Design a protein with these regions (language model features):
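Juxtamembrane interface elements at the cytosolic ends of transmembrane helices
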Residues: 27-35, 109-115, 170-196
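Membrane-water interface regions at transmembrane-helix termini and the short interhelical loops
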Residues: 29-43, 105-125, 142-152, 156-158
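Membrane-interface loop-to-helix entry segments
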Residues: 101-105, 162-173
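Single conserved hydrophobic/aromatic residue that forms the stacking wall/gate
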Residues: 1-7, 11
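Hydrophobic alpha-helical hairpins/lids featuring a short glycine-rich hinge
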Residues: 90-136
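Hydrophobic alpha-helical transmembrane segments
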Residues: 16, 46-50, 101-102, 128-130
Length: 205
């Protein structure tokens, strides 16, 4: 019993340390995306990355995590949300704390990947709506397929240890769809009188 408790504590600490490192990826993404955009849009990019985490936290707490880690799944596709957070918030968080924090930062990462692909071409309010949707439905459902034992991909033996499919593939596919919808950026590369492209805001990235 002492060994089992110690092992669980080590696993929990590992999850929390990993979550802290992934959390700082938000700052990294913000700097990279700022480096790819014009200086006048730097503040917009920073706010979008901040909103990914803020909005994502609220919706992931309310429904996303319960949907992702549901105990009952419908044909392995969609989980029946665990609504214990509304009746026993303290107990729910205490029991699932490390897993919740770990998946929360991954959810924010998946949402942030899209920001760079649609930089300078989306309104702030529209982006906030997108951020809420992906954090509330898209990420919890597809991550549940992989990381919940009841998910259909998990049932087939699919294994994704670090999130290459659950996070980066989903973020990349969503970014591609968004980039196709909004089209190319206009006015990013402007030539001077000599025909040379003016400097871009690449230092932060």
């Amino acid at each position: 019993e002492p060994y089992r408790r110690q092992r669980q504590m080590c696993i929990r600490d590992r999850f929390l340390i990993g979550a802290a490192l992934v959390f700082f990826m938000q700052a990294g993404f913000a700097m990279v995306e700022t480096g790819f955009t014009r200086a006048k849009n730097a503040g917009n990019i920073i706010m979008k990355n901040l909103m990914d985490f803020c909005i994502g936290t609220v919706v992931f707490v309310l429904l996303g995590f319960g949907l992702m880690m549901a105990e009952d799944y419908v044909f392995g596709l969609v989980g029946i949300p665990n609504l214990d957070i509304f009746t026993d918030f303290g107990g729910f968080i205490k029991e699932n704390a490390s897993s919740f924090v770990f998946n929360l930062v991954f959810c924010a990462t998946a949402a942030t990947i899209v920001s760079g692909a649609m930089a300078e071409r989306t309104k702030f309010v529209s982006y906030c709506i997108y951020s809420g949707v992906i954090s509330l439905f898209v990420y919890p459902i597809e991550a549940g397929w992989i990381w919940n034992s009841q998910g259909w991909l998990a049932q087939l033996g699919f294994h994704d240890f670090a999130g290459s499919a659950a996070i980066h593939s989903v973020g990349g596919i969503t970014a591609l769809i968004g980039a196709i919808m909004v089209g190319p950026r206009l006015g990013k590369y402007v030539k001077d009188k000599a025909g040379k492209i003016k400097k871009v805001n690449a230092i932060p990235g």
